């Protein structure tokens, strides 16, 4: 079992040969209690058929080593999906891929898929929001499982939609099946979009003006290389960036979020991940390199 008291883990690989087994082994190495994967390349829609034998092996490994992992697998949808595009062909392509991703998420025993909601490009933002909600409804109707689509808060690059709680709530409100929709709060994205996250309780209170806290299904716990409101979306390691270690510790230990998986998506240092040390630091509330 993990010494990690928090429901805390990281993005891990999903590489050829071992796939989910490799993801679990990497998570155990970092002493994580949850993890997130892409089930294929983040930047394209190429996907290999999942090996059920490897999935079964991974499930067995999780049950033996840390049963919490089996309950807290998160999948991230590919970045190319844009359900808010003014182009119908782009929306249709994204919808079809999202359906594929939801079914793959279910196959690897995950119930949470994080989605970047999309960009308006040269169209009206409210029109884009309606497109996103409409296509989320179609994806949910087309998938016969209980996977929850978690709309991620965005940093505000270009014409990204979902850069504040109001926009995220409009998307969620447009989804008919509320059991299949949730939110992923990204600390770097919120900071970069201009949201003050120095006091999690205050931030959550502001969120609750738009949506119930029960909609928060995933936290992406990241520091930021940029000042608040920069709209840059450049993640930094915990304690190295402009958000700051003490504030991110508050997010990691917040009681209201105790049962929400917190995923590190921080950069490598010297070509190596430092997730294990970040998990130690966040648990102990003491920063060490």
Swiss-Prot record:
Pfam families: AP_endonuc_2 (PF01261). InterPro entries: AP_endonuc_2 (IPR001719), AP_endonuc_F2_Zn_BS (IPR018246), Xyl_isomerase-like_sf (IPR036237), Xyl_isomerase-like_TIM-brl (IPR013022). The keyword DNA repair applies. CDD domains: AP2Ec. GO terms for molecular function: deoxyribonuclease IV (phage-T4-induced) activity; DNA binding; DNA-(apurinic or apyrimidinic site) endonuclease activity; phosphoric diester hydrolase activity; zinc ion binding. Binds 3 Zn(2+) ions. PROSITE patterns: AP_NUCLEASE_F2_1, AP_NUCLEASE_F2_2, AP_NUCLEASE_F2_3, AP_NUCLEASE_F2_4. The keyword DNA-binding does not apply. Keywords: DNA damage, DNA repair, Endonuclease, Hydrolase, Metal-binding, Nuclease, Zinc. It comes from the Bacteria. It catalyses: Endonucleolytic cleavage to 5'-phosphooligonucleotide end-products. Zn(2+) 3 binds at residues 189, 233, 235. One of its GO terms (biological process) is base-excision repair. Zn(2+) 1 binds at residues 76, 116, 152. Belongs to the AP endonuclease 2 family. Endonuclease IV plays a role in DNA repair. It cleaves phosphodiester bonds at apurinic or apyrimidinic (AP) sites, generating a 3'-hydroxyl group and a 5'-terminal sugar phosphate. This is Probable endonuclease 4. It comes from Malacoplasma penetrans (strain HF-2). The lineage of its organism: Bacteria, Bacillati, Mycoplasmatota, Mycoplasmoidales, Mycoplasmoidaceae.
